[in-house]
UniProtKB/Swiss-Prot annotation:
Classification via InterPro entries: Endonuclease_NucS (IPR002793), NucS_C (IPR048301), NucS_N (IPR048302), NucS_N_sf (IPR049173), tRNA_endonuc-like_dom_sf (IPR011856)
Enzyme Commission code: 3.1.-.-
Gene name of the encoded protein: nucS
Protein species of origin: Pyrococcus furiosus (strain ATCC 43587 / DSM 3638 / JCM 8422 / Vc1)
Protein name: Endonuclease NucS
GO cellular component: cytoplasm
Enzyme class: hydrolase
One annotated GO molecular function: single-stranded DNA endodeoxyribonuclease activity
Length: 267
């Protein structure tokens, strides 16, 4: 296949998609497929997504994303390090640890694009919510004594958590950050994240809304839902050194101290 910066196939046959996948793997290309498909996931749980038009993105690092026409987050995904193969009309992404499989059965492919992307830059985060997260990582006690932040922008079932960590009792703590006055929407968003993590880890999950202030309606809803609020002003200026994120393996050490039961590892 003659290589150009981008190869576009309209109404590609399965054989052409397979060929593009092979080239993407060998040349570290970014493959995007627009198709009608069904999706099956099997791992720590099971899920099935019926027939529909979706965007399938396969990145050189193994990331595998399936987007619907709405919402920012993928409806299904696999993280970097996953391996992708094609069997018949099915794209299969396999994650080894923990063992998870995402299978996409292509019913009809409308287009496929192989993009030989060159991008060696790293994102420089500016903006007050990013700086709020940095401040929390450098000084966790602004949330509470004993809080340990572990992840920033952590993808979970229903979205992306701004900051995810644990408290001194071993509870998982979800932080939703807002640089301005928080409203009802922010509370509802936090509740969705907390509920999603409770499905996997039980009731040992807390949700904290972090903002300079909040509306009266947001305050009442927080109290009603059993969620919490911490007042925090965004830093005014200045860059700070990046804090390295750890895995949640440390939860096992926390459990030895507190005697709590460890939640399963969060993907």
């Amino acid at each position: 296949m003659e290589m150009t910066k981008a190869i576009v196939k309209e109404n590609p046959r399965i054989e052409e998609i397979k060929e593009l996948l092979e080239v993407a793997e060998s040349r570290e290309g970014l493959l995007t497929i627009f198709a009608r498909c069904t999706v099956y996931y099997e791992g720590r749980a099971k899920s099935e997504l019926g027939e529909g038009d979706r965007i399938i993105i396969i990145k050189p690092d193994g990331s595998f994303l399936i987007h619907q026409k709405k919402k920012r987050e993928p409806v299904n995904w696999q993280p970097p390090g996953s391996k992708v193969k094609m069997e018949g009309n099915s794209l299969i992404s396999i994650r080894r640890n923990p063992k998870e499989t995402l299978k996409v059965d292509i019913i009809e492919a409308y287009a496929a694009v192989l993009f030989m992307a060159e991008d060696y830059e790293e994102l420089t985060l500016t903006g007050s919510e990013a700086e709020m997260a940095e401040l929390i990582f450098q000084n966790p006690n602004v949330i509470e004594e004993g809080f340990k932040p572990m992840f920033r922008e952590k993808p979970i079932k229903h979205g992306i958590v701004d900051v995810l960590g644990v408290d001194r009792e071993g509870n998982i703590v979800v932080l939703e950050l807002k640089r301005r006055r928080a409203d009802l929407h922010a509370v509802s968003q936090l509740k969705r994240y907390v509920d999603a993590l409770k499905e996997e880890h039980g009731n040992k999950v807390r949700g904290i809304l972090v903002a300079p202030s909040l509306t009266e309606g947001a305050k009442k809803l927080l109290e009603k839902l059993g969620l919490e609020f911490r007042k925090l002003e965004p830093p005014k200026k200045g860059k700070k050194k990046s804090s390295k994120q750890k895995t949640l393996d440390f939860l096992n050490d926390t459990v030895r101290i507190t005697g709590a039961s460890p939640p399963e590892a969060i993907q």
